[in-house]
């Protein structure tokens, strides 16, 4: 601490020091200890046994008060397209019946062109609040998806309350982002289906054998600092890994790992006759799974992609 104070005094007094900068590099005895891999969030897709009447169920789902320490639905969001003024009047009546309900008009057209009248009213309906609404303030409001509605369910897991986001599509498909384990997913869906059965009169079965993992975010740390430009050159020119490093736009090394289950050696390089592309429009034609990982100066490594947990050790 005294050494730092002396340096600060020299800087304040504009005193020039001839002390050379010391560059410290690890020697041969340095043995790094990598941390365990931590799966932070997963996005899963599930299915119910039949289709869902979205609007009917949405209006009947009850919202619990945020201050009450119990399980239930905290928030629900839907996007509704009204094609006539009568539909808007009926929509306003449903909104007034809901507790803590607001709406945002995303698009409104009411014009007369010749002999035809064009009318369109698109609204995002939001009822209830979640933890994110109380902590964060978003100036630009997010839109919502068609043919589905989203609910945030509070569950109790290991004596702690957690909030789980579930999107329900009219086909019976479920999308659950941001979960850490399958147990919280099953608890949340079980609570939701019980509420639908009790309040709406519809009985659905959750098909547990059809659950798919579409995205996993994981990370670990090397426990030492990384010289990014040198590592970038090694990855790109020695190992031929698709790598990009521009510290002005992103602080880490952005890499792509091409995984193909048919390859005997997984080196992260695409060996297909028709090279796999990173273009979003042509991604469906790829034979390889493209997994992204980012390497930061502090030694932290973030892995993102649509893959199975068994592929982690290979990467």
What is the role of each PLM region?
Residues 1-315:
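Intrinsically disordered, low-complexity polar/charged tails and linkers
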């Amino acid at each position: 601490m005294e050494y730092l104070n002396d340096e600060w005094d020299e800087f304040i007094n504009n005193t020039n020091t001839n002390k050379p900068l010391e560059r410290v590099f690890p020697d041969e005895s340095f043995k790094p200890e990598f941390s365990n891999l931590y799966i932070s969030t997963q996005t899963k897709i599930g299915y119910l046994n039949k289709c869902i009447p979205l609007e009917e169920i949405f209006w009947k789902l009850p919202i619990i008060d945020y201050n009450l320490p119990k399980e239930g639905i905290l928030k629900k969001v839907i996007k509704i397209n009204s094609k006539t003024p009568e539909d808007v009047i009926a929509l306003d009546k449903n909104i007034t019946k809901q507790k803590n309900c607001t709406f945002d008009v995303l698009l409104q057209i009411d014009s007369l062109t010749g002999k035809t009248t064009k009318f369109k009213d698109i609204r995002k309906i939001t009822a209830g609040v979640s933890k994110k609404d109380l902590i964060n303030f978003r100036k630009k409001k997010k839109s919502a998806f068609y043919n589905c509605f989203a609910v945030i369910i509070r569950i109790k897991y290991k004596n702690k309350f957690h909030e789980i986001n579930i999107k329900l599509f009219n086909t019976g498909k479920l999308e659950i982002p941001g979960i850490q384990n399958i147990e919280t997913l099953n608890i949340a869906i079980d609570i939701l289906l019980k509420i639908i059965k009790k309040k709406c009169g519809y009985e659905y079965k959750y098909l547990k054998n059809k659950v798919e993992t579409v995205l996993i975010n994981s990370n670990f740390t090397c426990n030492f600092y990384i010289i990014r430009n040198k590592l970038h050159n090694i990855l790109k020119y020695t190992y031929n890994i698709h790598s990009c490093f521009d510290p002005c736009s992103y602080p880490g090394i952005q890499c792509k790992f091409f995984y193909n289950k048919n390859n005997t050696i997984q080196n992260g390089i695409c060996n297909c006759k028709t090279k796999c592309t990173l273009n979003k429009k042509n991604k469906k034609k790829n034979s390889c799974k493209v997994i992204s990982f980012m390497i930061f100066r502090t030694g932290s490594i973030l892995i993102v992609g649509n893959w199975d947990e068994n592929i982690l050790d290979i990467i």
